[in-house]
């Protein structure tokens, strides 16, 4: 279904990627609606012949990027990003590309959020299985932002049914935007993911506790030194 939307509206949007930089531009307005910066890592779980095997796969090279700034799904406005790529470990023996679809939605509460995603894999020299992985509706996800803000996270996790996950490392994401350029402006405001926000809160506390402990150690050492000096003074008298 998603693929049909992309094909239907392909003439309305253009998309591109350079290394780990992906964007979708509305050809009617010339404005960019989606920007995604980040490195993808796929943690895949296959249950084959009563055994469970796990594989970690990364990008090798991007084949093509498509997108849509004016999509509709279930009577809801959506924006889509479709990435076809060659994974690490691919060879001429297994030359089929992999495909990642990401769907963004918007509501009265948020400017954008990821509402759906699918990953279609093929056999490679490193992964002897293939399959289609879909979003786990029960998986926690916080790739969202309000107003004109973007999303930032050291590692954004997208859960898939069966225990697989998609990691987007060093991720900066925005959708439903109307940006003149295809990169984030220097004054872009970001909303930090929950995990990073907690880390930012914990680090000052830990540093403060370490400094307090260091002060106590120095003070105790000073007092012990003074006490020894006094005892030596009494002994000499």
Curated annotation (Swiss-Prot):
Biological process terms in GO annotation: establishment of protein localization to organelle
Disulfide bonds: none
Signal sequence extent: 1-17
Protein name: LAMP family protein lmp-1
Membrane topology of this protein: Single-pass type I membrane protein
A Pfam family: Lamp2_2nd
Alphabetized PROSITE patterns for the sequence: LAMP_3
Family label: Belongs to the LAMP family.
Side of membrane Cytoplasmic, spans: 226-237
GO CC field: gut granule membrane; late endosome membrane; lysosomal membrane; phagocytic vesicle; plasma membrane
Membrane spanning residue stretches: 205-225
Extracellular side: 18-204
């Amino acid at each position: 279904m998603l693929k049909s939307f992309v094909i239907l509206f392909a003439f309305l949007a253009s998309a591109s990627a350079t290394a780990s930089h992906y964007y979708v531009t509305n050809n009617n307005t010339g404005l960019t609606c989606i920007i995604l910066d980040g490195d993808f890592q796929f943690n895949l779980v296959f249950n084959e012949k009563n055994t469970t095997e796990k594989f970690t796969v990364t990008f090798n090279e991007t084949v093509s990027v498509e997108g849509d700034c004016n999509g509709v799904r279930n009577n809801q406005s959506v924006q889509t990003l479709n990435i076809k790529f060659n994974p690490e470990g691919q060879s001429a023996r297994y030359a089929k590309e992999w495909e990642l679809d990401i769907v963004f939605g918007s509501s009265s509460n948020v400017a954008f959020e990821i509402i759906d995603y699918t990953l279609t894999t093929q056999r490679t020299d490193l992964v002897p299985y293939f399959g289609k992985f879909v979003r786990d509706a029960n998986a926690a996800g916080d790739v969202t932002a309000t107003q004109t803000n973007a999303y930032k996270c050291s590692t954004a996790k997208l859960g898939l049914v069966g225990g697989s996950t998609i990691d987007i490392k060093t991720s900066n994401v925005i959708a439903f935007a109307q940006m003149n350029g295809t990169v984030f402006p220097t004054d872009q405001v970001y909303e930090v993911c929950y995990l990073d926000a907690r880390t930012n809160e914990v680090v000052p506390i830990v540093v403060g506790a370490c400094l307090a402990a260091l002060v106590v150690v120095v003070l105790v050492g000073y007092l012990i030194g003074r006490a020894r000096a006094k005892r030596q003074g009494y002994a000499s008298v």
